[in-house]
Regions:
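Hydrophobic, aromatic-rich cap/lid helix
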Residues: 173-201
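Short alpha-helix in the alpha/beta-hydrolase fold that links the catalytic acid
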Residues: 208, 222-230
Length: 266
């Protein structure tokens, strides 16, 4: 079910107001945000755990002259209401697919270049594998979960290390704001399915061209792990962005956009 949402200004700083709508299915609702640019490639942005589409702010700003952007807030994150139970990663991908099918019918949105950050990369991998007609290319930014550290204790340790490893102020401010909106209860509910999902089992099924991006100081999904991710992709490439950690999408959105655009042209 699709519900139109009233446009408001202010959340995304200097960005123009997007078209907004909600999509609900089976007690789970996600919010969609679209910056239309007819004739340009359509990008779908899927955020990580504890976050919302605001984490892509700088990436969106850099991409707007070159692309149409559709960003989502997954159930319980950003502007989307919290459901009673957390979906698996695969079921989350199916919810996103249903929302995009509806958007294709109602708004004429074509094949997508799907971009996922952290947990969002897990969702994008499932989406690309299950719906090759919908996803033309995939970008996996800091894809979780590192197979060598798939426990709550290890992930918590790495998140703390990453937080205090020279993270830029903008990444801290946006990250704290989004985590506070999510709240610890829902974060932990969604963390279970995130840790259970094995992205390495899905990667060989992704037949589209795929780009893996990671910050050189990422402690949560380090470059060594992302190299393994790229190797598992039939048509994968890896780029390491100098400097930033796990929230490089926030701190280095412009650099990420530049690399993605260069990849599309190659």
């Amino acid at each position: 079910m699709v519900k139109q949402s009233r446009s408001t200004r202010g959340r995304l700083g200097g960005l123009p107001d997007p078209e907004r709508w909600a999509y609900a299915q089976g007690g789970h609702e996600l919010r969609c945000f679209r910056w239309a640019h007819p004739g340009k490639p359509a990008f779908l942005l899927v955020h990580g755990i504890g976050m919302g589409h605001l984490t892509f702010n700088r990436f969106i700003e850099a991409m707007l002259p070159h692309a149409e952007i559709i960003a989502v807030d997954l159930p319980g994150f950003g502007d989307s209401p919290e459901p009673e139970a957390a979906l698996s990663i695969a079921d989350t991908a199916e919810l996103v697919a249903a929302a995009m099918r509806a958007a294709t019918t109602e708004r004429g949105i074509g094949p997508l270049i799907a971009v996922g950050h952290s947990m969002g990369a897990q969702v994008v991998s499932e989406l690309a594998a299950a719906h090759p007609g919908m996803v033309d290319r995939a970008v996996l930014f800091a894809p979780s979960v590192n197979a060598a550290e798939r426990t709550l204790k290890q992930q918590a340790k790495r998140m703390v290390q990453d937080l205090f490893k020279g993270k830029p102020l903008i990444a801290i401010v946006v990250g704290v704001y989004e985590y506070l909106r999510t709240g610890p209860r829902w974060f932990l509910k969604k963390l279970g399915p995130t840790l259970e999902h094995r992205i390495e089992d899905t990667l060989p099924k992704v037949q589209q061209p795929a780009l893996v991006l990671v910050g050189s100081r990422d402690r949560v999904t380090p470059p060594e792990w992302c190299y393994e991710v790229a190797l598992e992709l039939p048509h994968g490439e890896l780029t390491v962005l100098g400097g930033p950690g796990h929230e490089a999408m926030i701190a280095e959105g412009e650099a990420a956009a530049e690399r993605v655009l260069h990849w599309l042209e190659g």
